[in-house]
Each structure stands twice: as structure tokens, then as C-alpha cells.
Amino acid sequence: MNINKNILFYLKHSHVQAWNFLSSHGRFLEKNVPGLKVSICLNSKEFLDRLPEAEVIVVWFFNADWLVKAPNLKFIFTPAAGNDWIKLDKSTVRVSNGRFHGPMIAESIIGAIFYFLKAFHFSKKCNYRKNGPG
């Protein structure tokens, strides 16, 4: 199957390197999805300059006023868990947000519950004072 789609990526974060879409990610997608062409924007100016031709974008956020600059836009994908960073009322553009966060959040909550149930915070404090086991 040949996709024949150009996808515009603007996934940059100044503080969390893992949240950045790198050229190696783009090469991986192009290699494994026949016909896919990946374009990566490194800043908002570059993204807004390329937006008029885009049909599919992958972004952390999208401002509603950018929609007038995107006459060909059909899909917005975001890895973000919620939809609060992309607000499009009554738009023909389909928005799809990340749905993979559930297990990670559940594991974090269970870890926090066990931390307090097993009194790890108290044990740690005792160990610092040399009052506890260890």
C-alpha cells in the first residue's frame, strides 16, 4: 500500500528533549511507510510558512486563528493526552489526540498508592536518621 501523503510535523519543546520530533524519527517513518513524505518544522515561523500546503499536521498545539492559513488542512494529530491545546469549534478539520497515556498514568497512581501504603516516606526518613532498618 502506498500512502502518498505529506505530513507536517511541528513537535518542539525547549525543556524536554524526548518531546521533540527528530529527523531520525522522520527517516524511520519514511522508510517504513511507503509514499510518506515527512516535513519537520523547527520553529513556529517555519510551521506557519508551510501550513498553507499542509493536509495533515502533527503538533503539540494549534491556535484557532491559524486555521485561515490552512485551507487544505484535513487532519490534526497530537500526542497530547487532552484536547485543550487544540480548540477548533465547528471545523471540518478532524482532530485526534494521544490515547496511549492511560497505562502510564495508572502505573504512576498505583506506585504512589503503594509508596504511602507501605510507608516508604517514613522508612526513608528513619533511614536518614539511622533509626530504621538497614
Where are these regions (language model features)?
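A short, basic/flexible loop-to-alpha-helix module at the beginning of a structural domain
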Residues: 130-134
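N-terminal glycine-/charge-rich "phosphate-binding" loop or analogous flexible N-terminal tail
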Residues: 1-54
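Phosphate/diphosphate ligand-binding glycine-rich loop within oxidoreductases
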Residues: 55-128
